[in-house]
């Protein structure tokens, strides 16, 4: 829960525009209640019977994520993966390398 509170702090300070947490369903319901109380937008993606991905942040980012949330993260296109990583604040040069690697693999198997 400490990590979650830190993510809220970073979001409110403008350090992050989007946060992704994978957690059990029970924790997600507690977290969702707290986000609603602070009027922070969020959405939940089913991962398994016991786990969910909880995204929260700026509405523009959540709207973009909604365009591909209907599939598991390991099924994202290289472009969707790059976009999500950038929105989550991951190192952009590493994301670009990951994009190029995934794009090359996809072209090699096509």
Could you describe each region identified by the protein language model?
Residues 1-110:
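Domain-length accessory/inserted modules outside core catalytic folds
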């Amino acid at each position: 829960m400490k990590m979650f509170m830190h993510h809220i702090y970073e979001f409110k300070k403008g350090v992050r525009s989007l946060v992704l947490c994978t957690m059990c369903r029970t924790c997600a319901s507690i977290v969702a209640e707290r986000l609603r109380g602070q009027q922070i937008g969020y959405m939940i993606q089913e991962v398994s019977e016991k786990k969910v991905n909880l995204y929260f942040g700026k509405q523009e980012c959540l709207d973009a994520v909604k365009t591909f949330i209907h599939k598991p993260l390991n099924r994202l296109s290289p472009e969707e993966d790059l976009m999500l990583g950038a929105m989550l604040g991951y190192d952009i040069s590493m994301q670009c390398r990951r994009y190029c690697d995934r794009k090359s693999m996809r072209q090699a198997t096509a």
